[in-house]
Amino acid sequence: MKITDLRCALLGGHPVVRIVTDEGVDGFGQIESTKPYMVPHVLFFREALVGEDPTNVERVMLKIRQRGSFKPWGSAISAIEMALWDVAGKAAGVPVYKLLGGKVRDRVRIYNGGLRFPMTEYTPEEYAESTRKMMEAPQGFTIIKQPIGFHSPMKRVIPDFYYGQPSPVGLQGALDRGLLTERGLKHLVACVEAMKAVTGDGVGLALDCGPGFNPNDALKIARALEPYNLLWLEDMITGDYTPYVLADLYRDVTWNTTTAIHTGEQIYLRQNFKDLIEKRAVNIVGPDPADVGGIAELKWIAEYADLHGLMMAPHGVFDGLIGLAALVQVSAALPHNFIAFECPIGNPPWWYDVVKGLPDPIVQDGHITVWDRPGLGIEIDAQAAQQYLRDEDKTFFD
């Protein structure tokens, strides 16, 4: 089997990758929906892929992996890697998890990545109501993650939340940093107290916090929240769109609190997790398969983290339904340090008409049952997808 073409199109504005082979077996990957500019970055690798055997996934990846970097190049390579595994599984007639070593679990736990209920005032009462709605959702979440602090409009909405001037626009946490005020700390703790009054001890609560907090404030927050037994505090210092990790700063926080600290969604490749893991600078790592270099890369990181006593909770909120399929396959094969992955959704809802093969409902009792269809286990309905392609992408499925 040989690769004859590498294609990338915007499907409703979301980048989708297709690997075409000479035997009629296609593979698909998906890039985060927030990156519609990614098409040329993917197509840059076409020359390196054409003529290669896509079932030799690692051989192909060795040709392109070193050309990646922090977003966007790492995102392009990650989507290509997903598509390679999709082809390899289909060619072998087995689900991807079989090629990754087989199932460790029959169901994978998820948490509410793509499902959020809007808030306007970011008060304790609103957080409690939002959390209550998530607990009542049909997915039956056993873990709920809420945005707070610099990872939410709280920094703008709450007067004197921190000593700084919040930017009026921009990615959450990407632009704003500063020293937390006493008022800000008390407000943050009050919001957590309100949410925990709703969840009790039956549903785990995690917080997406930044980045933006300095290490001293991060430690102050973590210690203040120790009585609430949170699952984790995520991306307090770096994360999201910061192109570095700062493991030593995270270690200063992690080693001085019992509240679990989590980061890793922005990191590309295992080598860039090495410092974080070996220094045990956090308690939980959370690579995103759409950014880290793909699903096999994520599995390697999970295993290395497990050797060092760290847990794994992958990121995935913007990975779409193809990314969801990839997350299910790799999470089935992860070691026992796996907690749950952040579950992406189809948005807009027409994605569920385009991506075929997913269970209905997808999530039950906070879990997804691992399916056994070949490859990633999904297919793209080309006819249903046509209306959502740009004019220049109309030949994507030819």
Task: Please provide the spans of the model-predicted regions.
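Glycine-rich phosphate/pyrophosphate-binding beta-alpha loops
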Residues: 11-13, 26, 30-36, 69, ...
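Structured beta-strand/loop patches that form or line metal/cofactor-binding pockets in enzymes
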Residues: 1-28, 348-355, 395
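Metal- or metallocofactor-binding catalytic centers and their adjacent structured scaffolds
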Residues: 20-94
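Metal-dependent enolase-superfamily TIM-barrel catalytic cores that perform enediolate-based chemistry
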Residues: 107, 112-251
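Extended hydrophobic packing segments that form well-structured cores
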Residues: 374-398
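Hydrophobic alpha-helical hairpins/lids featuring a short glycine-rich hinge
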Residues: 73-111, 115-127
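Shared catalytic-loop signature of beta/alpha-barrel
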Residues: 39-40, 47, 52, 59, ...
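Conserved, mostly hydrophobic/aromatic
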Residues: 3, 24, 80, 93, ...
